[in-house]
Regions:
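Short helix-perturbing small/polar motifs within transmembrane alpha-helices
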Residues: 15, 28-42, 60-69, 225-230, ...
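Membrane-embedded hairpin module used as a gating/binding unit in multi-pass transport
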Residues: 105-197
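Membrane-interface helix-loop-helix junctions at boundaries between adjacent transmembrane segments
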Residues: 21, 32-60, 64-120, 256, ...
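Hydrophobic alpha-helical transmembrane segments
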Residues: 22, 51-59, 120-124, 169-173, ...
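Single conserved hydrophobic/aromatic residue that forms the stacking wall/gate
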Residues: 1-12
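Structural signature of hydrophobic alpha-helical transmembrane segments
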Residues: 2, 46-60, 186-195, 232-239
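Cytoplasmic-side transmembrane-helix entry/capping segments in multi-pass membrane proteins
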Residues: 19-28, 78-85, 213-220, 237-239
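Hydrophobic core segments of alpha-helical transmembrane domains in multi-pass membrane transport
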Residues: 29-33, 58-65, 88-98, 121-136, ...
Length: 289
């Protein structure tokens, strides 16, 4: 049985009653910092904090599926991170409640560097493995890849269903190499957050992203660094570029020029939107996109 869930991905329902919502549940963990905030950071007496954190986490899980299904019509599938958008709005509500009672959320930036050689070797091996696996496991690969590159990516088009697993594996590997090359090109470090962004670009190589629609968005962020006050390798800007490829369908549908514009604009919005939810939404760029 096939369905299109609130993340926008058309896929097969898992053979369990919860199967239809597994994908939404995985993306909904973007609001997991809220649970920690209520359970431990607020320092409520006794076990009240832990119980409140559990209650808040369960409430997030209950609210996100119907809310995401409704909010998908706002961007009409041109943002691949629909749950990130939904989580940003829901996180803003929770943080607003906290602030109305006098509690201010804080930001804690932990940003490592100096491990580029180790992580680069791992990423190159991983993505080259995907490409080789795709090359060795399918026929008619060139035409299948052309089919993928012709797609806009809107509403998370399922490339595995469209062109097969082999072409999708190659596309995943290519996307991962592009993301890695971008970080190195702008002299950014390979660390937890940037590797997360690279792996996200690679993962969505199976449903929405390919070289033709992500490169214009990345270029738009680079263009913004020439005219705006921040540096291209600032932590927030690096993440805005990598996760900003959520807007890849705009480049796929309307052309590279509008993809550049989307990346240029989103790089500014992403730097301000985190103040709304106090950093509680881990998919902040999905919210700004």
């Amino acid at each position: 049985t096939r369905f299109r869930n609130v993340t926008g991905v058309q896929t097969c329902a898992l053979p369990i009653s919860f199967g239809e919502h597994v994908y939404t549940a995985l993306f909904a963990t973007s609001l997991s910092p809220i649970v920690t905030e209520f359970a431990f950071v607020l320092q409520l007496p006794g076990r009240a904090g832990i119980l409140l954190g559990i209650f808040i986490g369960v409430s997030v899980g209950l609210i996100i599926p119907p809310l995401a299904a409704h909010l998908k019509v706002v961007h009409k599938g041109y943002s691949l991170y629909n749950i990130g958008f939904t989580a940003g709005i829901l996180g803003t509500v929770y943080v607003s409640l906290l602030r109305s009672y006098g509690y201010q959320t804080g930001f804690n930036m932990i940003w490592s560097d100096g491990n580029d050689r180790l992580f680069l070797g791992f990423l190159l091996l991983l993505f080259i493995f995907f490409i080789l696996l795709g090359l060795c496991s399918g026929r008619g690969l060139a035409s299948s890849l052309k089919t993928i590159f012709r797609q806009s990516g809107r509403s998370c088009e399922d490339f595995i269903e469209l062109s097969g697993i082999s072409a999708s594996l190659v596309n995943i590997g290519i996307n991962g190499l592009i993301g890695t090359a971008y970080v190195l090109l702008v002299c950014g470090p390979l660390n937890g957050p940037t590797i997360g962004g690279i792996l996200t670009i690679a993962g969505f190589g199976a449903c929405g992203k390919h070289a033709r629609n992500i490169i214009p968005v990345l270029f738009g962020v680079m263009l913004g660094s020439l005219t705006k006050v921040w540096n291209i390798n600032d932590p927030a800007v690096l993440l805005a570029a990598l996760f900003g490829t959520s807007l890849a369908p705009i480049a796929g549908r309307y052309g590279w020029a509008w993809g550049v514009v989307a990346g240029f604009l989103n790089s500014s919005v992403a730097l301000c939107s985190s103040a709304l939810h106090g950093g509680m939404n881990l998919y902040n760029t999905g919210f700004s996109a």
